[in-house]
UniProtKB/Swiss-Prot annotation:
Origin species: Bacillus cereus (strain ATCC 10987 / NRS 248)
Biological pathway: Amino-acid biosynthesis; L-leucine biosynthesis; L-leucine from 3-methyl-2-oxobutanoate: step 2/4
Binding site for [4Fe-4S] cluster: C337, C397, C400
Name of the protein: 3-isopropylmalate dehydratase large subunit
Reactions listed under catalytic activity: (2R,3S)-3-isopropylmalate = (2S)-2-isopropylmalate
Gene giving rise to this polypeptide: leuC
Pfam families: Aconitase
Molecular function via GO: 3-isopropylmalate dehydratase activity; 4 iron, 4 sulfur cluster binding; metal ion binding
Keyword annotations: 4Fe-4S, Amino-acid biosynthesis, Branched-chain amino acid biosynthesis, Iron, Iron-sulfur, Leucine biosynthesis, Lyase, Metal-binding
Taxon lineage: Bacteria, Bacillati, Bacillota, Bacilli, Bacillales
């Protein structure tokens, strides 16, 4: 019997196995940010320990930083967390991408762009969306603060091996339909618990056609389906993406050979298998308070089936049978570790070029990193956004979560390219709708959702 990609990644990192069936995994890369690390570093101090492998640890500031004026941090707790991370990294000799550094950005954006993320690695971070890095054929997952301390101290982690789920994606996406729509479709069909106890492996002709940044979007939201991680076998596109980046391997040919072995064998069996044909897939919009509460843009909102639906409709101020086109949009957020990379910004810019944001709509573009921001500005994207009426911000997690000044007011609706739409996620009483960058950009122009596949809806939508 052949091996799955998960098996190969797991077996390469098992240091020991205990009597309870838990495996001690060696961790190749530990990513750190300001929110989940303070107690972990303090735990090292209290036990007089050091960071075992500072060279395999990398920290950045992302969750709490303001994106309008990065140096003016008025929130006392946010400032304390940022200052604490700076002090901890200095004391324990951990590399830090500080505010203003060219390497600073959202942790799951800078890992790949710096070449820290590589095929075959085990990668952890005190953040749910660590699964993003699985797009490179890495086993990457989020951990809690006590586990952050364990990895800092030992460079290992006790884990129970998950089961393997194969998700085959077949067909070619229509124009205006993206990886974000695939994952929202998957969640709407199978729910937020389908992946519980599993690692999702995405594969198939649709994956082969995708560029790396869309693959990252898919893996990023595997956690929203309950999965431990999302993974994609590395291929030529993966190798080309990593090659030449700052922290990429210098002995490239040796690593490339090892990476070529990372795939699921033809005779291997998944514990669970799902097949999706994306040919007729449409853009998706979430209407409720978890990522599985989504519909195609050309569908009506569903009927109420249980108390959860009842509560979601009430919180969102929407009704069963309502058209998605009738959902008002007062805020637009293009950013987050899901959709803030250069290709995401290029797609959004192509939609709004030469157009104007609807009066009464507040629209933000927040690049995922300093490097993304600089690259976008070199292409003139900031001019396109600003001329359209968008705010062009500094990199950070921003409006994805209500931990910094970028928040949605109570009772107002936001078209967001982020990954979670829970109650209060973007601020107290905020109503979040998850969409692709193209859909978010179009919503900014009209003040409601439109079908980006159509060249006109109340007027022309520019694609160039």
């Amino acid at each position: 019997m052949g091996k799955r990609l998960l098996d190969k990644l797991w077996e390469r990192h098992v240091v020991a196995t205990n009597e309870n069936g838990l495996d001690l995994l060696y961790i190749d890369l530990h990513l750190v940010h300001e929110v989940t690390s303070p107690q972990a570093f303090e735990g090292l101090r209290l036990t007089n320990r050091t960071v075992r492998r500072p060279d395999l640890t990398f920290a950045t500031m992302d969750h709490n930083i303001p994106t309008k004026d990065v140096w003016n941090i008025t929130d006392r707790i946010a400032k304390q967390q940022l200052d604490t991370l700076r002090e901890n990294c200095k004391q324990f000799q951990v590399p830090l991408a500080d505010i203003g550094d060219e390497e600073q950005g959202i942790v799951h954006v800078i890992g790949p762009e710096l070449g820290l993320t590589q095929p075959g690695k085990t990668i952890v971070c005190g953040d749910s969306h660590t699964a993003t890095h699985g797009a490179f054929g890495a086993l990457a997952f989020g951990i809690g603060t006590s586990e952050v301390e364990h990895v800092l101290a030992t460079q290992t982690l006790w884990q129970r091996k998950p089961k393997a789920m194969g998700i085959e994606l077949k067909g070619k996406l229509q124009k205006g339909v993206y990886a974000k729509d695939i994952i929202l479709h998957l969640l709407s069909k199978y729910g937020v618990a389908v992946g519980t106890g599993y690692v999702m492996e995405f594969y198939g002709e649709t994956i082969q056609a995708m560029e790396m940044e869309e693959r990252m979007t898919l893996c990023n939201m595997a956690i929203e389906g309950g999965a431990k991680a999302g993974i994609i076998a590395p291929d030529e596109k993966t190798v080309a993406y990593v090659k030449g980046r700052k922290y990429a391997p210098k002995d490239y040919e040796t690593f490339e050979k090892k990476w070529s072995e990372l795939y699921t064998d033809a005779d291997a069996m998944y514990d669970l298998h799902i097949s999706i044909d994306v040919t007729d897939l449409a853009p998706y919009v979430t209407w409720g308070t978890n990522p599985s509460m989504g519909v195609r843009i050309d569908e009506k909102l569903p009927e109420k089936h249980d108390v959860n639906d009842e509560r979601a409709f009430s919180y969102m101020g929407l009704s069963p049978g309502q058209s998605t086109y009738d959902i008002p949009v007062q805020h637009v957020f293009i950013g987050s570790c899901t959709n803030s990379r250069l290709s995401d910004l290029e797609i959004a810019a192509s939609v709004v070029k030469g157009r104007k944001v609807k009066e009464g709509v507040r629209a933000l573009v927040v690049p995922g990193s300093k490097r993304v921001r600089d690259a976008a500005m070199q292409k003139g994207l900031h001019h396109i956004f600003e001329e359209a009426g968008f705010e062009w911000r500094e990199p950070g997690c921003s409006m994805c979560l209500g931990m910094n000044p970028d928040q949605v007011p109570e009772g107002e609706h936001c078209a967001s390219t982020s990954n979670r739409n829970f109650e209060g996620r973007q601020g107290k009483g905020a109503r979040t709708h998850l969409v692709s960058p193209a859909m978010a950009a179009a919503a900014a122009l009209y003040g409601h959702f439109v079908d980006i596949r159509k060249e006109s809806y109340d007027g022309a939508i520019s694609y160039s």
